[in-house]
Amino acid sequence: MKNALLFAVLIFLTISCSSIKNTQEAIGNGNYDVAINTAVKKLKRNKTKKRNQPYILLLEEAFEKATAKDLGNIIFLKKDNNPENIETIYSLYEQLKRRQEVLKPLLPLYIVNLNRDASFQFTNYDDEIIANKKQLSDYLYSKVTTLFNRNNKFDYRRAYNDLEYIEKINPSFKDVRNLMFVARERGVDFVIVSMKNQF
């Protein structure tokens, strides 16, 4: 009985340590969101458990590095000044906001060994998200207008996909719904089928 209990405890410790090691490796490899998700999952169960203390430190590190990486990418893409990058910039701002929203329910996280609360630098990205959403909608709308002028079935299909995306991120933008209807009608292949009964 003692051997079985000892074996169970040993396996449990091995699994716990490997999970921490996997989270550390994710951070080391630059997979910050994987590390954040793993740490959040563990801390959601019980954030005060002593065994979960390493996850708080890992979460702090991963959050800081992920935020710095995304903000660095945004700065670079803005300097590039290519309209094709607007969607990526918008997505990065959305990702920054989502990452913060995942952490908020867990706070405060207390680090026992350091006798302090975990520190997460939160920023309100709403203005940037709204500005980029407007800019992206305008860019895609002008792209759709160009595709419509080509008067080609495949371009109407591409236009429909762009219009659908605009409607998703910015509902009721200009006359997007009407253009979606037109793009769908002009992008559809109609096939005539006739049936004959033969014996």
List PLM regions with ranges:
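A structural "domain/chain start" motif
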Residues: 24, 28-29, 37-40, 45-60, ...
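Positively charged n-region of N-terminal signal peptides that target proteins for export
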Residues: 1-6
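Bacterial Sec signal peptide processing site at the extreme N-terminus
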Residues: 11-34
